[in-house]
A protein has these predicted regions:
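Bilobed "Venus flytrap"/periplasmic-binding protein-like clamshell domains
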Residues: 1-11, 44-48, 65-124, 139-143
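Acidic, polar ligand-binding/catalytic clefts
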Residues: 5, 9, 13, 17-82, ...
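Loop/turn elements at helix/coil->beta-strand transitions in domains of secreted/extracellular proteins
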Residues: 14-17, 36-38, 85-87, 110-112, ...
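A ligand-binding cleft/hinge motif common to bilobed small-molecule-binding domains
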Residues: 27, 41-53, 100-107, 128-163
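A short acidic, often aromatic-flanked loop/helix-cap motif at beta-alpha or helix-coil junctions
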Residues: 28-29, 121-124, 164
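Short glycine/serine/threonine-biased micro-segments
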Residues: 33, 92, 166
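Alpha-helical segments with a strong preference for the paired helices of cellulosomal dockerin domains
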Residues: 34-36, 125, 129
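A short beta-strand structural signal in non-transmembrane regions
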Residues: 166-172
Length: 172
C-alpha cells in the first residue's frame, strides 16, 4: 500500500490517485501486460525466466524471503526430514512456490499430492480444515496465514527454508 501511494505521489503528484486491483498469482502478469494495471506491487519473485521471457521489468528487490512449510503440531513432523511419500501439500498454483515444491519433493524422492489454489486464503483454509498435511508458501506468508487459523498455536512453521525469494515490484 505504501509503495503504491509513493509511486502515485511521485508519478501523478497525488498519493490518493492510486487504484488497487486485487489479483491472483495467475492473473497478475496478464493484468500488467494488458495495461489493466501499471505497477504490480505484490509478492512477486524476480526470477531469470520471468526477467527474460515475460517482457516486463522488475524494478528492484524490496524484500527477501524464502519458502517454508507449516504443519500441525500433532503431526509429529519437526522438519522436512519427517516428510513421507503420499502426503498432501496445499499451495498456490502458477507460482514459484509450486515449482519449488515439485523440485524439493523430487530431490527427496517423495511423491506428494498437490492441492493447488489460485488464492492464498483458499490454500490456507483448506489446510486449516485438515485437508492437507502441509501448507507451503514464503515464510512471511506462513507467519501471517498462521495468525488467522482457528487455533494458531496448533500449527508450526518448520525450520527449513527451501528457496531464496527476491521479491519486488514489476512494471511494463
Amino acid at each position: 500500500v505504501d509503495v503504491c501511494r509513493a509511486v502515485a505521489a511521485a508519478v501523478l503528484g497525488d498519493a490518493d490517485k492510486v487504484k488497487y486491483t486485487p489479483l491472483s498469482a495467475k492473473e497478475r502478469f496478464t493484468a500488467l501486460t494488458s495495461g489493466e494495471i501499471d505497477v504490480l506491487a505484490r509478492n512477486t519473485t524476480w526470477t531469470l525466466s520471468r526477467d527474460a521471457d515475460i517482457g516486463l521489468t522488475f524494478v528492484g528487490v524490496n524484500f527477501y524471503d524464502g519458502q517454508g512449510f507449516m504443519v500441525r503440531k500433532d503431526s509429529g513432523m519437526k522438519s522436512t526430514a519427517d516428510f513421507v511419500s503420499g502426503m498432501s501439500v496445499c499451495t498456490n498454483i502458477g507460482t514459484t512456490t509450486e515449482l519449488n515444491l515439485a523440485d524439493f519433493m523430487a530431490a527427496k524422492g517423495l511423491d506428494y499430492k498437490l492441492v493447488g489454489f489460485e488464492k492464498a486464503d483458499e490454500a490456507r483454509d483448506t489446510y486449516g480444515a485438515g485437508r492437507c498435511d502441509a501448507y507451503t508458501t514464503d515464510k512471511s506468508g506462513l507467519a501471517a496465514q498462521r495468525t488467522v487459523l482457528a487455533n494458531p498455536d496448533d500449527h508450526v512453521v518448520l525450520p527449513e527454508t527451501i528457496s531464496k525469494e527476491p521479491l519486488g515490484p514489476v512494471v511494463r
